[in-house]
Curated annotation (Swiss-Prot):
It comes from Gallus gallus. This protein is a transcriptional activator. It may play a role in the formation of segmented structures of the embryo. May play an important role in the normal development of the vertebral column. This is Paired box protein Pax-1. Residues 81-129 are annotated as: RED subdomain. Residues 133-155 are annotated as: Disordered.
């Protein structure tokens, strides 16, 4: 049987509905890692710009160049074995970077260049699955807010629980000897803010 291919605008041949060959997919990723822009990769390999962008986006998300299964589930790149090795690397060296973990996975033969997780995937694993183990109080332990601070005596809720500064009774309190005021202030820190402030003003 003949495979009928179509020619895109760049002169490249493709089969509609079928994924791009893995050799070309790998070449796209390699060129991108060399710093070549997707539009230049597109022209060089005669692959549409949308296809190049899609393959690179998938690689950045999953770390895999392999196409998704047609009509099936996507292959899991972060298998339990990979997660275990990432956890071991992190526990052995808490300061290790995600890209260093990626290099270790390749060097130790845990993954090959076709299925090694991307740096962003490793970072997500560290954050979601290992963060609570490796950094219990670190930046990955998010979501916990510090306990609220107690309201200050001058909070509007406690502004003038007793006679206000314009009330003659407050003026009378301010005219009293200042001796009992500190004691009252210490004993009832939220009950005498206005009397204390009036005493300070009147000397």
């Amino acid at each position: 049987e003949h495979t009928y291919g179509e020619v895109n605008q760049l002169g490249g041949v493709f089969v509609n509905g079928r994924p791009l060959p893995n050799a070309i997919r790998l070449r796209i990723v390699e060129l991108a890692q060399l710093g070549i822009r997707p539009c230049d990769i597109s022209r060089q390999l005669r692959v549409s710009h949308g296809c190049v962008s899609k393959i690179l986006a998938r690689y950045n998300e999953t770390g895999s160049i392999l196409p998704g299964a047609i009509g099936g589930s996507k292959p899991r790149v972060t298998t339990p074995n990979v997660v275990k090795h990432i956890r071991d690397y992190k526990q052995g060296d808490p300061g290790i970077f995600a890209w260093e973990i990626r290099d270790r996975l390749l060097a130790d033969g845990v993954c090959d260049k076709y299925n090694v997780p991307s740096v962003s995937s490793i970072s997500r694993i560290l954050r979601n699955k290992i963060g609570s183990l490796s950094q219990p109080g670190g930046p990955y332990d998010g979501g916990k807010q510090p306990p609220p601070q107690p309201a200050l005596p001058y909070n509007p809720l406690y502004q003038y629980p007793y006679p206000g500064p314009m009330d003659p009774r407050a003026a009378k309190m301010g005219a009293d000897p200042p001796g009992p005021v500190p004691a009252a202030h210490v004993g009832l820190p939220r009950s005498w803010p206005s009397a204390h402030s009036v005493t300070n003003i009147l000397g």
